[in-house]
């Protein structure tokens, strides 16, 4: 029977199992939902591989959201959904006001990297894991270093800036998931779980926004 298949068909049969084994960084985001066998550091590595691929500013959306959401804790997902509700409420109420006055939106998280930091740290091109530390029962802090690449025109060489942060991983439903983040070198030192003053209960309670 193998003779009738031909050499090409036999080759395809032999490599078929390998074709189904995709690395995490290249797999479809929907396939990352089952990460029960991963260590805290492995979960962080997969999460930040996606983050440095999509580089979302503010709340992840689209493909970034589909990739990152399954790797987050239920608490963190609820927090981001609340922020999204506040963001929707803000633009529903003030979009016309912002356009008329040419004001920048007054949402604190809109241009931040929620899992890497503000300003240039918001869009890292690379990351490295420096260390990990158990900080409680089924709770691990992973220390990260981010690299931001600044490119220039006219033949000038790129410049690289480095930032650091700590991501917290917790055990939930027998798997490790991302639960919190704090950027280092930022004053005041604020965790993502501390929330934002302008957002309460899914509604925007801050100011509409003014020029700097």
What kind of feature is each model-predicted range?
Residues 136, 141-166, 170-173, 177-212:
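Low-complexity, intrinsically disordered terminal/linker segments enriched in charged
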Residues 7-17:
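Bacterial N-terminal signal peptides
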């Amino acid at each position: 029977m193998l003779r009738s298949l031909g050499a090409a068909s036999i080759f395809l049969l032999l490599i078929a199992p390998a074709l189904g084994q995709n690395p995490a960084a290249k797999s479809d985001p929907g396939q990352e939902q089952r990460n029960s066998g991963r260590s805290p550091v492995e979960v962080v590595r997969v999460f930040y591989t996606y983050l440095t691929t999509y580089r979302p500013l503010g709340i992840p959306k689209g493909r970034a959201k589909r990739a990152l959401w399954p790797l987050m804790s239920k608490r963190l997902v609820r927090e981001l959904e609340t922020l999204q509700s506040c963001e929707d409420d803000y633009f529903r109420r003030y979009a016309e006001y912002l356009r008329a006055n040419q004001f920048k939106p007054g949402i604190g998280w809109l241009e931040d990297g929620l899992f890497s930091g503000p300003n240039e740290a918001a869009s890292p091109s690379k990351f490295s894991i420096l260390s990990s530390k158990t900080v409680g029962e089924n709770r691990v802090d992973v220390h990260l270093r981010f690299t931001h690449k600044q490119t220039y025109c006219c033949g000038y060489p790129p410049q690289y800036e480095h930032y650091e942060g700590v991501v917290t991983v917790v055990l939930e439903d027998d798997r490790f998931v991302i639960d919190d983040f704090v950027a280092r070198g930022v004053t005041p030192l604020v965790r993502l779980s501390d929330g934002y003053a302008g957002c309460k209960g899914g509604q925007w309670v801050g100011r509409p926004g003014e020029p700097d």
